[in-house]
Amino acid sequence: LLLLVLSLTLTILSGNPQVTIYSFVIVSLFAIIRLWNGGTLRSLINTFPILLAVILSVALSAPQLLPSFELVQKSIRATESYIGQSNFGLLPIKDFLKFFVADFFGNPVTRNYFGFLNYFETSGFVGSLTLPVIIFAAIFLRKTRIIYFFFLLLVVSVVLCFNNPLSYFIYSFQIPFLTQSYASRMLFVTTFAISILSAFALNQIKLRPEKQDNFLKCVIWSWAIFVGILLGAWQV
C-alpha cells in the first residue's frame, strides 16, 4: 500500500496531467477487475485499500495540485488550438513500425529524423522481438480477467493514439487535461499494456515447453505482418 501511495504521489508530482490521469484510471480499473470478487460488501472491503491509496496520494500532492488548478484556470491552454494544427497529435498508421523499429524514420541525434511531429512524442518502441510475443499472447495465452483487461487496454490505447474517425471525433472536443496535449502521449498506456502481456506470454512459454512450437509459428507470422506493414508504409 505504501509503495502504491508513493508511486501515485510521484506520478502527480511529475507534472504531466495526461500520464497522471491515465495512471489513476488504470490503477482504479485494475483494482476493480482484480479484487472485485464475491458479494458487494466483500468487494468493497477488498478495494478499500486502493481507494485509500488514491486519496492519500492526492492529499500528499495537494501543495502542488491546488496552485496548479489555479494556474490552469488562468492559462490559455484550454482555448488555444496548437494541437489541432498537428491533427491533435494523432499518429499516422505508418508509425506502427516504430513499435518494433525505433529509428525507422531516423533519429534526432543523428539529425536525420523525418517522421511525424517529433521523435520523443511519437516513439512507442517496445523491442524488435515483441511482435511474435504479442501474437502468441493473443492466440495461445490462457485468457483470464486480467489478460482480457490488458488486451482491452491495449486496443483502446491504440485506437485513441492513432489517426482514425473515432479518435479524431474524441479529440475534437475540449476535454480538460486529456485533449489539451498530443494524443500520442497515450503511447504510455500502449507500451505498458504490451509489456505486461509480453511478460505473461514469456512466463507461459518458460513454464510450458510444449508451447515453444506455437511461439515459432508466431515468429514466422510476425515477420509476414512486419513485411506487410513495411510495404504498406512504403506505399504511403
Q: What residue ranges belong to the model's regions?
A:
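Transmembrane helices and adjacent periplasmic/lumenal helix-loop junctions
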Residues: 6-33, 56-68, 189
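Alpha-helical transmembrane segments of integral membrane proteins
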Residues: 20, 48, 120-127, 147, ...
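Hydrophobic alpha-helical membrane-interfacial segments at the cytosolic entry of transmembrane helices
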Residues: 42-69, 83-86, 149-158, 217-230
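Periplasmic/ER-lumenal interhelical loops and adjacent helix-loop junctions
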Residues: 53-138, 183-188, 232-236
